[in-house]
């Protein structure tokens, strides 16, 4: 349907449909963010032999709603010597790209918004813009802790963006396309996690660093930097940074599901009667649970360990995966 609308001449009707689609997508993402935070606190609580949130609403289901309402009602404080324009712009720079990447995600064969031939490249290009919001927030706050957090984020994003991109080159070699729908369709016989297990391992580690999640959460390390790049933010601006983090996690989970877990395809052809969106949600939920598990169990790395691991371990492994995949593809095509 969206492709049909994209091919039509601009009109008030098509504009209205695009607005409705954007609002629906935003509602789904906000619903995910609301209850991802709740389940993260609940799961980590269980792992640490605690109960977790259980006060607001039945089983604590409205705890996140109460927290969001509290943030929105708090005073919006801006440091006296902060750069006003950039201080205001930073949360938008952090959030907008994280939401925009969802436009190319094919959740099923029919539920997708834009079928780009270079959907994978689009995602990689836009996701790199998020770091600009973090760096801008760190510099514009006129705070040493914020600045150090922003600089750490820049170094981390540059270091881990390289192996992240290289880890998906093997998939592009196997499928011959950067269209996310074509990548899913190419996994009908076997999911990419099997022939591209090395690439998957590199991707999921680099993705963890890109999300600034444990054990790579150095840009906002509470024990070292008070709160990192958003230490001077409060109210709805602070909420936008938190929202950007979980929206980005939503996008990364969707991308991993598409690239390595077969997207909406069933685990066996005999289970094809189950709707594709159900399979997508199940696979996506496995990744989200893995995020919670890692946060509950792993310690934070030092800065030198973080950088060394990216350049001395992940990058060589990603290059080896590209070489190995190229040899296999060449052999299959009869070049040897």
Curated annotation (Swiss-Prot):
The chain crosses the membrane at residues 17-37, 85-105, 116-136, 154-174, 190-210, 247-267, 274-294, 309-329. It comes from Brevibacillus brevis (strain 47 / JCM 6285 / NBRC 100599). This is NADH-quinone oxidoreductase subunit H. GO terms for molecular function: NADH dehydrogenase activity; oxidoreductase activity, acting on NAD(P)H, quinone or similar compound as acceptor; quinone binding. The lineage of its organism: Bacteria, Bacillati, Bacillota, Bacilli, Bacillales. It comes from the Bacteria. InterPro entries: NADH_UbQ_OxRdtase_su1/FPO, NADH_UbQ_OxRdtase_su1_CS. NDH-1 shuttles electrons from NADH, via FMN and iron-sulfur (Fe-S) centers, to quinones in the respiratory chain. The immediate electron acceptor for the enzyme in this species is believed to be ubiquinone. Couples the redox reaction to proton translocation (for every two electrons transferred, four hydrogen ions are translocated across the cytoplasmic membrane), and thus conserves the redox energy in a proton gradient. This subunit may bind ubiquinone. NDH-1 is composed of 14 different subunits. Subunits NuoA, H, J, K, L, M, N constitute the membrane sector of the complex. GO terms for biological process: aerobic respiration. Belongs to the complex I subunit 1 family. Keywords: Cell membrane, Membrane, NAD, Quinone, Translocase, Transmembrane, Transmembrane helix, Ubiquinone. It catalyses: a quinone + NADH + 5 H(+)(in) = a quinol + NAD(+) + 4 H(+)(out). Its main location: membrane. It is a multi-pass membrane protein. It is found in: Cell membrane. Its EC number is 7.1.1.-. GO terms for cellular component: plasma membrane.
């Amino acid at each position: 349907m969206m492709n049909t609308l994209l091919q039509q001449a601009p009109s008030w009707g098509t504009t209205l449909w695009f607005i409705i689609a954007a609002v629906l997508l935003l509602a789904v993402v906000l619903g995910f963010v609301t209850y991802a935070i709740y389940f993260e606190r609940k799961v980590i609580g269980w792992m640490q032999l605690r109960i977790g949130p259980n006060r607001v609403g039945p089983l604590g289901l409205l705890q996140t709603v109460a927290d969001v309402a509290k943030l929105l009602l708090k005073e919006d404080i801006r440091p006296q010597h902060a750069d006003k324009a950039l201080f205001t712009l930073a949360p938008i720079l952090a959030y907008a790209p994280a939401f925009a990447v969802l436009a190319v995600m094919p959740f099923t064969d029919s539920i997708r918004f834009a079928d780009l031939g270079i959907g994978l490249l689009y995602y990689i290009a836009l996701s790199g813009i998020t770091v600009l919001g973090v760096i801008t927030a760190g510099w514009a706050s006129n705070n040493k802790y914020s600045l150090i957090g922003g600089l750490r984020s820049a170094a981390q994003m540059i270091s881990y963006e390289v192996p992240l991109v290289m880890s998906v080159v093997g998939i592009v070699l196997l499928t011959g396309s950067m269209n996310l729908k074509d990548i899913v369709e190419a996994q009908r016989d076997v999911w990419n996690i099997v022939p591209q297990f090395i690439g998957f391992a590199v991707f999921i580690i680099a993705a963890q660093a890109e999300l600034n999640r444990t054990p790579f959460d150095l840009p906002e390390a509470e024990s070292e930097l008070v709160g990192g790049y958003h230490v001077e933010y409060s109210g709805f601006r602070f909420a936008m940074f938190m929202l950007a983090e979980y929206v980005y996690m939503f996008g990364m989970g969707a991308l991993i599901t598409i690239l390595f877990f077969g997207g909406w395809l069933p685990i066996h052809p005999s289970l094809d009667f189950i709707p594709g969106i159900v399979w997508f949600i199940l696979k996506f939920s496995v990744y989200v649970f893995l995020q919670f598990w890692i946060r509950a169990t792993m310690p934070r790395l030092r800065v030198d360990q973080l950088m060394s691991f990216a350049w001395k371990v992940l990058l060589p492994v990603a290059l080896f995966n590209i070489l190995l995949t190229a040899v296999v593809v060449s052999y299959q095509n009869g070049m040897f």
